[in-house]
């Protein structure tokens, strides 16, 4: 029987108290204030996924290993005489599944924003029947990351390979396949985090077959950890910039390819939507010499270069200059000012 996507409740007579009833006992003829409530069935169905930007070869973002699937298509046309139609919708899947489920959690659940942090990713397998097993772990990371160690059932292994693939750490341990329930996999890695609330989503896969990867479920994967989640919070940080660095305190733009330009490196923090970033060079009188950068950026590392010229393209005279790095956000402006010398 396919579960209904709605649950039905009637009032018990006690204000604010309801009891669940079958749909055929729900009296729709009553005034809504007496009839009860119809609620979304989040007990038997997962929540609706976010909308898909593209359907072509798109992996489902809903939980895996469910018997039934609901989907909703919204058709939009460009005018009154236009009509949108659907020819077909195809879902591809593999049988048997990789596992009944794989539970995962990350530690620590609080990390420094704007710094490379060390994390441990725990996974625990759940098998109850004939499943494929897996030998690959994918961990979605916000930036390129590095694996520093892998353990199977608390024993370190050296026979593994890893690489970055489509914004995910891909770790393969082909000679240590996971095929029984309760096995524990531990992946140690280092990753930059720039936004509080970053989710390190995970999947498991089988490198020895064409089975689709299977998503992990956040939960209690390690008895030694209490987080039971894949979301990492950021330590309190007031600034929007970190690791602001100049390539040199002095530049000599004379064409000899030695310190000809200034390289400004920085990490933008906490920007979950594009933020306007400006880099402007001033002289000591406060006049604008060069507008070097004016773009909308997301969180992460960035590099901006100034070649020692002004807005007209001419080489600036020797002296001391101020470089202003500024972010304009809904909460206000955040500014960093550093000095650089120009000499010949």
Question: Positions of the model-derived regions?
Answer:
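Short loop/turn motifs at secondary-structure boundaries
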Residues: 232-344
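Beta-strand-rich extracellular modules
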Residues: 74-76, 190-192, 205-207, 309, ...
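Non-cytosolic beta-sandwich-type ligand-binding/adhesion modules
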Residues: 1-95, 145, 293
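Short, compositionally biased P/S/T/A/G/V-rich stretches that sit at domain boundaries
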Residues: 89-112, 224-257
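Extracellular adhesion/glycan-binding regions together with long Ser/Thr-
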Residues: 47-60, 156-186
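Short beta-strand elements of extracellular/lumenal beta-sandwich folds
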Residues: 72, 107-135, 266
């Amino acid at each position: 029987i396919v579960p209904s996507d709605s649950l039905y409740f009637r009032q018990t007579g006690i204000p604010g108290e309801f009891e669940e009833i079958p749909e055929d006992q729900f009296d729709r003829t009553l005034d809504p204030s007496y009839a009860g409530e119809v609620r979304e069935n989040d007990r038997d169905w997962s929540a609706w996924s976010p909308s898909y930007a593209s359907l072509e070869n798109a992996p489902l973002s809903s939980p895996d290993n469910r018997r039934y699937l609901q989907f909703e298509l919204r058709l939009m046309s460009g005018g009154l005489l236009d009509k949108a139609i659907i020819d077909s919708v195809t879902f591809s899947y593999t049988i048997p599944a990789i596992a009944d489920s794989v539970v995962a959690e990350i530690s620590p659940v609080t990390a420094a924003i704007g710094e490379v942090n060390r994390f441990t990713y725990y996974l625990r397998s759940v098998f109850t029947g004939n499943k494929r097993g897996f030998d690959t772990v994918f961990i979605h990371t916000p930036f390129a990351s590095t694996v520093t160690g892998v353990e199977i059932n608390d024993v370190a292994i050296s026979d593994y390979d890893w690489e970055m693939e489509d914004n995910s750490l891909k770790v393969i341990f082909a000679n240590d396949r996971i095929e029984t329930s309760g096995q524990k996999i531990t992946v140690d890695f280092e990753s930059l985090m720039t936004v509080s609330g970053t989710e390190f989503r995970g999947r498991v896969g089988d490198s020895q077959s064409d089975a689709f990867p299977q998503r992990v479920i956040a939960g209690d994967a390690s008895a030694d950890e209490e987080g039971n989640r894949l979301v990492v919070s950021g330590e309190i940080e007031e600034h929007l910039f970190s690791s602001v660095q100049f390539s040199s305190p002095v530049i000599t733009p004379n064409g000899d390819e030695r310190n000809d330009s200034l390289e400004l490196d920085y990490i933008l923090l906490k920007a979950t939507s594009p933020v306007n970033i400006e880099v402007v060079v001033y002289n000591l009188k406060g006049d604008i010499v060069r507008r070097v950068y004016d773009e909308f950026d997301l969180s992460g590392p960035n590099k901006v270069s100034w070649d020692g010229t002004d807005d007209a393209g001419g080489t600036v005279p020797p002296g001391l200059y101020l470089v202003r790095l500024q972010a304009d956000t809904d909460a206000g402006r955040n500014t960093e000012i550093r000095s650089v010398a120009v000499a010949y």
